From Swiss-Prot:
PROSITE patterns named among the record's database cross-references: EF_HAND_1 (PS00018), EF_HAND_2 (PS50222)
Species: Rattus norvegicus
Protein name per its UniProtKB record: EF-hand calcium-binding domain-containing protein 11
Protein origin, superkingdom: Eukaryota
GO CC term (a single one): cytoplasm
GO molecular function, one term: calcium ion binding
Transmembrane regions: none
Domain EF-hand per the UniProt entry, residue ranges: 18-53, 91-126, 127-162
Entry keyword set: Calcium, Metal-binding, Repeat
Pfam families named among the record's database cross-references: EF-hand_7, EF-hand_8
Binding-site list for Ca(2+): D140, D142, D144, H146, D151
Length: 162
């Protein structure tokens, strides 16, 4: 068993009608000339409006490289796909943060082996202590006896079954 098998998975699926309307409204607001697509700058503004941060050059390049070469921009359909993926990633990260916080009962910002033992005894009481120790050691990337949120997030995203 590894952390990524513990149940935290992106929740792919349907977006609500109100959320879709909001995204379409943002698209239209950023498509000032009614071109039917968002330029690189339009896209950046739309992401700021929806997520509160300016996308990096790498992120913008990745989106623009998948854009229609005839329009040199991102269509509504493409924009909705990008926004939905970003929203799912955001929800997944929040879920990981929630799990980490549930493990971190002392609010220290890191987890110890004792935190792992306590959490696993509640959710998987028959799991051998040796397995809990192995999971902890694998999550503790720098072997300092503490699993930071970054360590935990990495383990949740990249863990492998043994």
């Amino acid at each position: 068993m590894f952390l990524s098998e513990a149940g935290a998975r992106p929740r792919a699926g349907e977006i609500s009608a109100s959320e879709r309307r909001k995204w379409v409204e943002v698209f239209k607001a950023c498509d000032e000339d009614n071109k039917g697509y968002l330029s690189r700058e339009d896209f950046k503004v739309a992401i700021v409006m929806l997520f509160g941060y300016k996308p990096s050059k790498i992120e913008a390049d990745a989106v623009m490289s998948s854009a229609n070469p005839d329009t040199s921009g991102v269509s509504l359909e493409g924009f909705l796909n990008v926004v939905q993926r970003k929203k799912e990633a955001q929800l997944y990260r929040n879920e990981i943060r929630h799990i980490f916080t549930a493990f971190d009962v002392h609010y220290r910002g890191f987890l110890t082996l004792e935190d792992f033992k306590r959490a696993f005894s509640q959710v998987a009481p028959k799991l051998p202590s040796r397995t809990v120790l192995e999971v902890f050691r694998e999550a503790d990337q720098d072997s300092d006896g503490h699993v930071s949120f970054r360590d935990f997030e990495y383990a949740m995203n990249h863990g492998k079954a043994k």
